[in-house]
Amino acid sequence: GMNSRLNIALREHNGLVYTAESTLTNYTDTSTWAIYFGCDPENIDKCLRIVRKELDKLMESPLNDRVFNAALKQIKGQIGVACDNFESYALDTAKAYLHYNKFEGMEDTFKHLKELTPSLLQEVAKEIFDAKGLNTLIFK
């Protein structure tokens, strides 16, 4: 997923960050998506350029089948593990019902994932990762 992509680009290939992650938070009428990384102050600009480059890659061309299928497999595994934690599953179910006025089980989620394609994912990336719609907050 995105966390892996960011950690490879920022930490493994360049040794610039201590940690890197992306998060998605859903609310009733909107969502926020964020990237977080921790680095030395002198590496901030370089890290921001690398993150932008990774986002641009996702916007410019669809994932190849191997990467796409590996990501789907990972997501399905994470959903399965999350469902094993009954308290977390109950909270997630309640949040989904609160936000969307409906509940979809794991089977429904997997059905939606089957409809996903690399091209569709690329189209969503073009919309979400457009630099004009992103903001940057830097804590020093």
What are these regions (language model features)?
Residues M2-N3:
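Short Ser/Thr-interspersed hydrophobic loop/turn segments at strand-loop and sheet-helix junctions
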Residues N7-E60, D65-L116, A131-K140:
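M16 family metallopeptidases and their MPP-like homologs
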Residues T117-K126:
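Low-complexity, intrinsically disordered Gly/Pro/Thr-rich segments
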